[in-house]
Structures are given as structure tokens and as C-alpha cells.
Amino acid sequence: MSQGVTAPFARHAMAYVLAGGRGSRLMELTDWRAKPAVYFGGKSRIIDFALSNALNSGIRRIAVATQYKAHSLIRHLQRGWNFFRPERNESFDILPASQRVSEEMWYRGTADAVFQNIDIIESYDPKFIVLLAGDHVYKMDYEKMLQQHVEQGADVTVGCLEVPRAEATAFGVMHTDTTDRIISFLEKPADPPAMPGKADKSLVSMGIYVFETKFLLDELRRDAADPNSSHDFGKDIIPYIVKHGKAVAHHFDKSCRRSSSEAVSYWRDVGTVDAYWAANIDLTDIVPELDLYDREWPIWTYGEITPPAKFVHDKEGRRGEAVSSLVSGGCIISGASLRHSLLFTGVRVHSFSHVENTVVLPYADIGRSCRLKNVVIDAEVKLPAGLVVGEDPELDAKRFRRTENGICLITRAMIEKLDA
């Protein structure tokens, strides 16, 4: 056990969230916002899950490193995460890329995004750093990961989970021994190695790391001085520690926050339009795998002040109704029907429209007599009356972004082209 440090270890830790990525596979959803700032689940942004996990785990010092088109993200953090109090030894720092090392360099990689802020980390003097990706959806108790890190005397502890081999090319893939020590680590291999005894599975990194702060800062300084390094945790830092130190795997099953003992371990990289749509629509299930109603592990976010959702008209063929759907505050469903859909704040759906399997981001407006199926509608989009999407694949592909799985993404620019 670390000298002078007692449980709970989270009170001695700083959470450092990497939130600078674009997430280009989300296509036009990230044209004007970073991936961590993309809306999710009716009220939240994707980054709220990592931040809420840190807060619920007992961590009271948090820093968020931003870079790509950060305005939307920074505004959200300032509005929704401004309740930390220095007089209670709490802190919440937003760290935009600001050429702190030289005038020529922004953040050159994930490791450099921490290295350039070493002075800020040292000013708080945390015993541990919990390094997090800000673009995944999951619920996890980081205290349990910290406990394993201390008990096993690791130099780094890496959060991991099993995924199908076909999906593992997008992750760091590891092999472990019987004590969970990592003996090999490959970043995004073209042919991911399988787990022993599980030919169709690979053990992959979740992008969650625990370090003792002094060890991490020493490694970052070593890496920064290496002209051959890409200054990335997955490509450089972790493989180096696996070879020269002690890297340990922490299995997500051990710390996943579940709604019941029978529930599955839920983690999603909502990095494509298909995955994003599916993860949101999953929430309309009777018992979704991701429990947003757990009052003991809430997902904190900016709570915009809105009136309740409203459903009006009760005539045959013009009835405001929703079945198996999530409808946020400020929405008005005026003589329209929703099925298996998720509406964010302030959405308006006009009479005679039918919306199914659709995700509608804040303040979108769906005109009269629209028929929508398997759609993602970006924020503040105004759909014209009579628009039909999800019935003619060829026409959809000409007008909108249509994925391989048949999901259509609609943005304001696409609607403006229809009117041109």
C-alpha cells in the first residue's frame, strides 16, 4: 500500500479527462462540436458519464483537457460542472490546448495533453491520477480500480473489457498472465490476438489508466524528450511500461455500476452514427442495459430550466402520444405519435407526424405530416412538412447521410440544400 495513503483512495486522486478528440466517424454530428460534447440520453453530453463516475466515486479534483472545436464543450462544463468549491479542497479545471510548451505546438497526442499541464497537476499534488477518455458511455466505480492498483503495487493499472475480435482493431489489445499482469500490449492491431480459450474475443483497453502521480510525471518527461515518440498513451507510454515496469489489467466487471446483480456490464464507444443511434434507442427498452434512473449513481449534467413535456390533441388520427419513448422537458407533441424514440429538450413535433426509432437532438422542429424511421436529427434542425425518411433508401442516401445499417443523419445544412 502506498505510504501515508489510506482508503478511500479516491480522495487522494485527481481525474484527468482527455476530451480533445473530434470523433470523425460521427460524421456531421462533430462538425461543430467535439465528440465528448455530443448529446446523449435525452439530457446529457457524452463527457458527463466519465465526469459523473469520478464524482460518484469520491474524486473531488477533476481536470478536462480540450482541443478540437471546444466551445460547446467548455460552455457545457462551465454551466453544468461549476459546483466544485476550493474551500472544500475541490477543483474543476478546463485546460484548452494553449501552446504552453512552445508557440508551435498544440497537444501532439494524448500523453502530451497531460505533459503540457504538469505544472497544474503538481500544484494540486494528488497521490494518484485517474486518466479517463471523455467519449465513452458507461458507469464505473473508480475507487475499486484504485484499490487494485495499490494492492498489486502496479506502475499503471489499465481498465479492460472483452470485445469481439472483429471490433478489437479500434482498441489497444492486451494479454495478461494469471495475476492480471499485462505481458503484451498492441495498439489498434490489424489482426487482434484472441484471448486464451476464447477464439472470438479480445481483451481491450478502455482508455482508463491509474498511476501514482510521481511515476506518471516522470514517464511523461521521459516520453517528451524522445524524438521518436508520438506522445500517445496507447502507442508509447503503456507499451513502454509493459516492457520496463509493472502494468496490471483491471477487469470492468469488477467495478461496473449495475442496477442489479443480473444486469450486464454496459460500456459503449458511441463512435459511429450507427453505434450512437443504437445506444440512444436502447434506452427506450422496458429494462435498458444502461440504467439512467439509478438515484445512487446519478449522471450529473447541466439542467436547463424548462417546462414539462406536453402532449396535446386527442382525436383519431391526430393524437399526441408516445410509446416506449423518452421525451425531455420543454417538448411539445402536438397531435403526433412517437414510438421507440428519444427526444432531447425543447423538441416540437407537429400534427399528423409519425416518428419511430428516431433520436431528436435539442430544439429540433418536425413539421406536419412527416414520417420518420431510423433517423438521427441534429440540434435545431427544422424539418419541412411532409418529409418522409426511412422508406426509400436511394432517395435518403441522395439527400442525407445514410449509414450502412440504414440510419439517416439529418443536419441543418442538408435541409437547407433541399430548399435550395
Swiss-Prot record:
Cystine residue pairs: none
Annotated pathway: Glycan biosynthesis; glycogen biosynthesis
Biological processes per GO annotation: glycogen biosynthetic process
EC top class named in words: transferase
EC number: 2.7.7.27
Top-level division of the source organism's lineage: Bacteria
Matching InterPro entries: ADP-Glc_PPase, ADP_Glu_pyroP_CS, GlgC_bac, GlmU/GlgC-like_hexapep, NTP_transferase_dom, Nucleotide-diphossugar_trans, Trimer_LpxA-like_sf
Molecular function as annotated in GO: ATP binding; glucose-1-phosphate adenylyltransferase activity
UniProt keyword annotation of Acyltransferase present: no
Keywords, in A-Z order: ATP-binding, Carbohydrate metabolism, Glycogen biosynthesis, Glycogen metabolism, Nucleotide-binding, Nucleotidyltransferase, Transferase
Pfam family, one: NTP_transferase
Task performed by this protein: Involved in the biosynthesis of ADP-glucose, a building block required for the elongation reactions to produce glycogen. Catalyzes the reaction between ATP and alpha-D-glucose 1-phosphate (G1P) to produce pyrophosphate and ADP-Glc.
Family: Belongs to the bacterial/plant glucose-1-phosphate adenylyltransferase family.
Name of the protein: Glucose-1-phosphate adenylyltransferase
